[in-house]
Amino acid sequence: MIEVKHLKTLQALRNCGSLAAAAATLHQTQSALSHQFSDLEQRLGFRLFVRKSQPLRFTPQGEILLQLANQVLPQISQALQACNEPQQTRLRIAIECHSCIQWLTPALENFHKNWPQVEMDFKSGVTFDPQPALQQGELDLVMTSDILPRSGLHYSPMFDYEVRLVLAPDHPLAAKTRITPEDLASETLLIYPVQRSRLDVWRHFLQPAGVSPSLKSVDNTLLLIQMVAARMGIAALPHWVVESFERQGLVVTKTLGEGLWSRLYAAVRDGEQRQPVTEAFIRSARNHACDHLPFVKSAERPTYDAPTVRPGSPARL
């Protein structure tokens, strides 16, 4: 059977006018190209061009295949170009990480400058559970620290971050060198309005120790920080979220146990992670976060249905 490479070779021979010139264009030796034509002609059962003709003359069969090359090769080129061009015109994004809005908004603006043709649709809400919506095709990408096993989703790591205990500067726990789960038993833990089972501090610090402090929901980060500063409770937040408040002296942060680390992922439906728009957004958002957020570590290795990696926790390394 004739292959695409044979059509390209025939076209090069027509354009160049001789075996020697065609061989140079194709970065082959003249003898190798001559052998290739002889082998093809033997398999096809007919000659393609007249040897040693000046100017080079193609046989009727060769002319037919040249017409085929002129029709097929441009179509192949156009198809490959279409495959490499973005087919998405809209990117529907949601977050499970309440604190992520602080860096994701400028990351979205930065991405839109380079991909102005892509409509960005950002969905958020304290009662919104985005991963099932992603599975059902209602969203294209979700920022999350939770991996759903056997979900049909692909999780691209964004960055690792430490969850720190956030306290008023004059809180008694601020003087402790080591924070244990029992230290929080009598405290009021201020949390975002999500189920406690989705909180890293609950799943990986308090629950294993059998400690259950009082919980109070707060809608946004700024109010939460103000309540902590007023000794109305304590909180557990990503270090990068509270860095500016800590620098101002409004709050202090402490390491939880040996260090509680989590990883943020960009979740998409498996098989769609290589779509040009999706891939470009994940790369752009990751780079923006790692360039602008303090106390985060870049994480680029793809993860499929794996538990959250927590650097510094030997049981999870």
From Swiss-Prot:
The lineage of its organism: Bacteria, Pseudomonadati, Pseudomonadota, Gammaproteobacteria, Enterobacterales. GO terms for cellular component: cytoplasm. Its main location: cytoplasm. Residues 1-59 form the HTH lysR-type domain. CDD domains: PBP2_MetR (cd08441). Keywords: Activator, Amino-acid biosynthesis, Cytoplasm, DNA-binding, Methionine biosynthesis, Repressor, Transcription, Transcription regulation. PROSITE patterns: HTH_LYSR (PS50931). InterPro entries: LysR_subst-bd, MetR_PBP2, Tscrpt_reg_HTH_LysR, WH-like_DNA-bd_sf, WH_DNA-bd_sf. The gene is metR. PANTHER family: HTH-TYPE TRANSCRIPTIONAL REGULATOR, HTH-TYPE TRANSCRIPTIONAL REGULATOR METR. Residues 19-38 bind DNA. Control of the last step in methionine biosynthesis; MetR is a positive activator of the metA, metE and metH genes. MetR is also a negative regulator of its own expression. Binds homocysteine as an inducer. GO terms for biological process: methionine biosynthetic process; regulation of DNA-templated transcription. GO terms for molecular function: amino acid binding; DNA binding; DNA-binding transcription factor activity; transcription cis-regulatory region binding. Belongs to the LysR transcriptional regulatory family. This is HTH-type transcriptional regulator MetR. It is found in: Cytoplasm.
